[in-house]
Amino acid sequence: MRFHTFNIGKPHIDAWWARNRRLGIITAGFSGEPGDRGDTLLHQMEEGDWVIAYSNGHGFVGAGRVGPVATYRLLSVDELPSGWEATHRHLRQVDWVHAVASLVEAIPAKEVGRQAPRQTK
């Protein structure tokens, strides 16, 4: 089992974080193409690994267990749900075990002695 720190990416707003929690996912952006960095990052995680979510300007917002690799999806622009807040199209299932309800409740990186991750672009 490994631990991955992962930036939830833009926009850094409650609605985007709530969507990640509600859908039970972590997402990545980059170019939104097969084989890009987002694809690689989400495929490097093994089922049962922990993902520690971070939001720029706020801090750490959640921790969850990564689902099976079979839950990875690359959505086309047409498949994005109505109101999708981000440009991210790579998704992977996460069972959010610990999470703040609002970004204002985030734990700042300096409080845990870590730097902010830069993983989702």
Each language-model region and where it sits:
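Short, well-ordered loop/turn sites that connect or cap secondary structure elements
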Residues: M45-E46
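Short beta-strand-centered aromatic/proline hotspots
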Residues: F60-Y72
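Contiguous surface segments at macromolecular interaction interfaces
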Residues: M1-A15, I25-R37, L74-K121
